[in-house]
């Protein structure tokens, strides 16, 4: 959450909405204190307010420049999408390793006979390499599906209440998106 807030603050600095240097001051002073955030959230019943209050306690007066024109959804959805993309990229690397391993095993067992199965019972003889090749092809399809899912979730939405940009210049979102490695949505949320 801190990173998304800071990217937006940096964008606001660029467009002279907030004073220059504020984002770096906030970055230096802000320390995440999970226990304190939990304490505040028990009272406020609002996770983002608890987060911002905790940061404000550490940062002081400059904290007023955080979250300007934004909603909880701007921060949480964008943050969640960054986390999903990072996690999915780890899975992609793992899938690549599985594919490499399967390819080696396919070659190794290309002449090793085994019993094929159909409807859960013995069928015609096949090679174990052929059986592994079916797994290989399925993992390739899984990789394509995961890449497609990454593209779907890789959006940054910093557009204010119900996506209207009423209190937030769309340029802020465009600038902040470059730091998140996400893309702009084709339409805003309503």
Predicted regions and their residues:
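Conserved small/polar residues in nucleotide/adenosyl-binding loops
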Residues: 180-186
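A helix-coil-helix interface module used to build multimeric assemblies
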Residues: 1-165, 169-177
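Acidic, Ala/Val/Gly-enriched low-complexity intrinsically disordered segments
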Residues: 188-190
């Amino acid at each position: 959450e801190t990173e998304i807030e800071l990217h937006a603050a940096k964008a606001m600095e660029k467009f002279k909405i907030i004073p220059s240097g504020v984002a770096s001051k906030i970055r230096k002073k802000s320390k995440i204190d999970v226990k304190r955030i939990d304490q505040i959230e028990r009272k406020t019943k609002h996770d983002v307010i608890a987060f911002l209050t905790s940061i404000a306690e550490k940062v002081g007066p400059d904290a007023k420049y955080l979250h300007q024109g934004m909603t909880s959804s701007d921060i949480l959805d964008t943050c969640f999408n960054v986390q999903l993309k990072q996690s999915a990229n780890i899975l992609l690397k793992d899938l690549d390793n599985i594919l490499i391993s399967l390819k080696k095993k396919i070659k190794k067992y290309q002449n090793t006979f085994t019993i094929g199965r159909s409807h859960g019972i013995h069928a015609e003889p096949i090679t174990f390499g052929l059986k592994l090749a079916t797994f290989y092809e399925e993992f390739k399809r899984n990789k394509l599906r995961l890449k497609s899912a990454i593209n779907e979730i890789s959006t940054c939405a910093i557009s204010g209440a119900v996506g209207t940009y009423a209190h937030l210049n769309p340029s802020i979102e465009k600038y902040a998106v470059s730091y998140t490695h996400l893309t702009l949505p084709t339409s805003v949320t309503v």
